[in-house]
Amino acid sequence: FEIEDAWQIIETGQPMPARNADSHDVLGTFQIVASRREMRRTPTSSDDLIELLQDRHRIMMAARPDRNPGMFKMQNNHAGDSHFVDCMLVRGTLRKGYEFYQALEHPFAKALFMLFMVSEVHPFNDGNGRISRIMMNAELVAADQSKIIIPTVFREDYLNALRRLTRKGD
């Protein structure tokens, strides 16, 4: 979407007829990120992390029942040469990841860890990038820090950085 199109969808609450499902993705994402209360919620336990991820994903993907909103993937997924966590290991990996997250103190460190963990696990069939950025920004909002917005023009730089972390471990 162009910015103007997304703004119209948000302002009117009406999807664009030619892109109904995509429009609802915009509305669902906006519903989460526009809520100060929702964006101040951060996980307090590994169970809470799982519930928070599933709740936010359910809202974000509500218009796409074929993508199983709020349900963790049932098949392994990959993007190009990046293969993500096995579908049978998603919950356990998130639980273990929460232990590392819990040890972090600085909000920025927590935000980046949350972004990377969710992106690396890729727990859902679709919407993993958006949900990882929502989780990252929730950490920042909860600490009264500025949100991080990744403009489309920097999309490749952002994805290349994630790929490098995934593949080279640095």
Please give the residue ranges for each predicted region:
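FIC/Doc superfamily catalytic core
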Residues: F1-D170
